[in-house]
């Protein structure tokens, strides 16, 4: 259970723009990380993506032109997560943090361009047995008195000692292949243009190597959105998705989608490795 309730205010500050947040994140210094540091909750007001912004997102990722994909809710939630982690009391540097899990659940249809309020709270987990530190950010979005979606992300903030058990070879899941896509070398920049996430590790080789990667990798939520677009063509509109990011996907790679029709689970495979494990809930009727 989260220990910090969302702040309730009659009015809330506007949600900062993504480029400004990313610039501040480059210089964010960590505070002292105790066993259970208390990080203030945040509340921001923002507007849902308008029809034009959604059209660009949908065209890139394969959704219907007028769709409001559940994955698009992450675009606002990510900004709320970043703004919350920029608190001086957040104990970790943002550079080097790794997005390891995400879940999004839609409670009601989001109206394009409608005013939303985002409330975000933080849980910093105790160190694992290997010394790793994780944090969880939970954002809930409301349209007046109506809750419209919740988005929860888990991040690896500090890597621990190498765990031999977790380093064992991955078993490939016994699911049929039902689709896939070829990533272009410009897809990281294309997704940045529609999402606002200009993290350098997704853009070009020199920038990625500057941050310790051999090659640029695609945004994890780009992979999730591409998978959802293919799954929706088979099972109807998705209203919830939960994923675990297992390995990075380099730009220029081929991604395979494994999924058995009529089941919730899916897997993305790249280069013989499991990249994403997930489950999806489709709208009833």
Where does each model-flagged region fall?
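A conserved acidic, glycine/proline-rich C-terminal tail/linker
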Residues: 227-257
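HotDog/MaoC-like acyl-thioester-processing domains
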Residues: 1-36, 80-82, 97-183, 251, ...
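Hot-dog-fold acyl-thioester-processing enzymes
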Residues: 1-99, 164-234
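Short, glycine- and charge-enriched coil/turn segments that flank and shape catalytic ligand pockets
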Residues: 63-64, 143-146, 236
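Hydrophobic residues on conserved beta-strands that form the core of alpha/beta folds
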Residues: 41, 136, 150, 238-240
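A broad, structure-centric signal for solvent-exposed, well-ordered loop/edge residues
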Residues: 53, 111-113, 190, 208, ...
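Short, surface-exposed secondary-structure edge patches
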Residues: 107, 214, 246-247
């Amino acid at each position: 259970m989260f220990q910090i309730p969302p702040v309730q205010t009659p009015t809330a500050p506007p949600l900062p723009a993504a480029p400004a947040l990313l610039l501040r994140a480059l210089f964010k210094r960590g505070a002292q990380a105790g066993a259970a540091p208390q990080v203030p909750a945040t509340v921001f007001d923002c507007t849902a993506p308008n029809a034009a912004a959604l059209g660009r997102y949908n065209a890139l990722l394969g959704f219907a032109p007028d769709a409001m994909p559940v994955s698009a809710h992450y675009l606002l939630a990510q900004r709320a997560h970043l703004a919350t982690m920029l608190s001086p009391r957040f104990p970790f540097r943002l550079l080097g943090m790794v997005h390891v899990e995400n879940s999004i659940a839609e409670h009601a249809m989001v109206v394009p361009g409608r005013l939303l309020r985002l409330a975000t709270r933080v849980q910093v987990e105790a160190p694992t047995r290997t010394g790793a530190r994780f944090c969880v950010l939970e954002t809930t979005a409301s349209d007046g008195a109506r809750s419209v979606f919740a988005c929860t992300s888990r991040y690896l903030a500090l890597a621990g000692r190498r765990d031999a058990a977790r380093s064992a070879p991955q078993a490939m899941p016994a699911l049929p292949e039902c689709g896939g896509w070829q990533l272009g070398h410009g897809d990281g920049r294309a997704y940045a243009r529609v999402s606002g996430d200009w993290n350098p590790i997704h853009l070009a080789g020199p920038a990625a190597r500057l941050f310790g990667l051999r090659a640029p990798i695609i945004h994890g939520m780009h992979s999730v959105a591409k998978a959802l677009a293919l799954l929706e063509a088979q099972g109807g509109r998705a209203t919830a998705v939960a994923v675990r990011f297992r390995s990075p996907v380099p730009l220029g790679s081929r991604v395979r989608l494994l999924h058995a029709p009529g089941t919730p689970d899916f897997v993305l495979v790249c280069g013989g490795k499991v990249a994403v494990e997930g489950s999806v809930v489709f709208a009833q009727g």
